UniProtKB/Swiss-Prot annotation:
Biased composition (Low complexity): 129-140
Gene behind the chain: nabp2-b
Protein's UniProt name: SOSS complex subunit B1-B
Predominant location: nucleus
Cited Pfam families: Ssb-like_OB
Amino acid sequence: MTTETFVKDVKPGLKNLSVLFIVLETGRVTKTKDGHEVRTCKVADKTGTINISVWDEVGNFIQPGDIIRLTKGYASLFKGCLTLYTGRGGDLQKIGEFCMVYSEVPNFSEPNPEYTAQQSQNKQAQAESGTGTNNHNSSSPAPPAPDLDNGNGSNSSGPSTNQSTAPAHSTSGRITRSQPNHSLPGAPNSVSNGKEPRRTGKR
């Protein structure tokens, strides 16, 4: 059995995560080139907030106030922002509504210069190793550099906590839908106030 991970402990590259959170905001649907629907939701627990990318019809069932358990999730960087995803064989299970203590700060999905610098170093190292291996016999190309776990670098100075006073409903629904185990460009990278900037294709 996987132990629960708090939002503050989520780092890029972690896999098989089990996270319990409340949905604060649901983002607009974005369509990928291959027809998938992607929605970014802002979620929180008592340690802070993070974005989760939800694929296809599962996003239609998620509403603000839902308390959800993510199982077999993973964390990755999307445009320099830490984001949760449902892994292969993982799911999102609604276990309640409204009554959960959460903190809106710190937001661990805000762009982090430490992560951005690490991604740049990884890309540079990959480019250098790619040119160096061209002179040697190599049976396969170098794999992409993984996101390294180097801490979140966020400063949480006295997070505020909120607790909703609405009664809890004894609803328990299961939202199951595995998504591809990869992140695609085009998903919004943050949810701020429910209004997201329009995204366009690669330029």
